[in-house]
Every structure is written in C-alpha cells, then in structure tokens.
C-alpha cells in the first residue's frame, strides 16, 4: 500500500476497518549474520559478552554468540509496523524466551489478527 506524494511514494497505514480477525500477516525472513547479531546488541547497549564474543559464549555454555532479546523485540516492532504502516502504534509486546537465534539462523516471523476491540487490533506472532 502506498500513496503518491508528488514524485515520492509514501507508505499508507491500515485502518481499523481494513483489518479482520483471522487476517494473516505476510511472513518475514531475516537471515541472521554474526555482524547483525553483534551490531544490534551494541545498538541496544547490551554489551554482554555472549552477544559478541564466541569463545566466551561457548565458555558460558552456548554453542556460539546469540541475539539478545532487545534485538528480537525491535524486529517484532519492525514486522508489525511494516504490515500495519507508519501510523500504527504498538501498545504492547509480550515475548517469551524460547530457542536462541545464532549466526546462520533465519528468523522467520508470521502472525495473524486475533482480536479487535475499541479501535485496538491484537496480533499473535509465530
């Protein structure tokens, strides 16, 4: 979705009435490189060695460095706003820690609209 503004194209946002319970969000795949994992940890000011030092990550019981939860949260926000548009406001994100994301993994997100009430749309990600 987009609208033309002069010669530029501006993304448009979904409206409440555009969204129905059961609507599926398009999947998003993010290849996770060592550089991405380190850069996003630094960008979120998470200097824990398990996010940038492979030998110390192994010493602490991990097979390699792994992505921090703040980076995961940021990618979730990007996923939702890429779908809903620039006018969307994320009111709440609830993430459960599961399997870590390591270099070479692909982070795949998908989701669906699970509820609508009083102008608020709820989306569950998988």
Predicted regions and their residues:
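Hydrophobic beta-sheet segments that form the core/acyl-binding groove
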Residues: 88-126
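Hot-dog-fold acyl-thioester-processing enzymes
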Residues: 2-89
């Amino acid at each position: 979705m987009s609208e033309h503004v002069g010669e530029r194209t501006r993304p448009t946002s979904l409206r409440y009435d555009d969204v129905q319970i059961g609507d599926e969000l398009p999947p998003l795949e993010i290849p996770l490189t060592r550089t991405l994992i380190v850069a996003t940890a630094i960008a979120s000011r998470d200097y824990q060695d398990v996010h940038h030092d492979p030998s110390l990550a192994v010493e602490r019981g991990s097979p390699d460095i792994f992505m921090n939860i703040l980076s995961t949260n940021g990618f979730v926000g990007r996923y939702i706003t890429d779908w809903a548009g620039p006018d969307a406001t994320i009111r709440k994100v609830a993430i459960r820690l599961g399997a870590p994301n390591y270099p070479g993994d692909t982070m795949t997100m998908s989701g669906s609209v699970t509820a609508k009430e009083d102008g608020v749309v709820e989306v569950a990600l998988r």
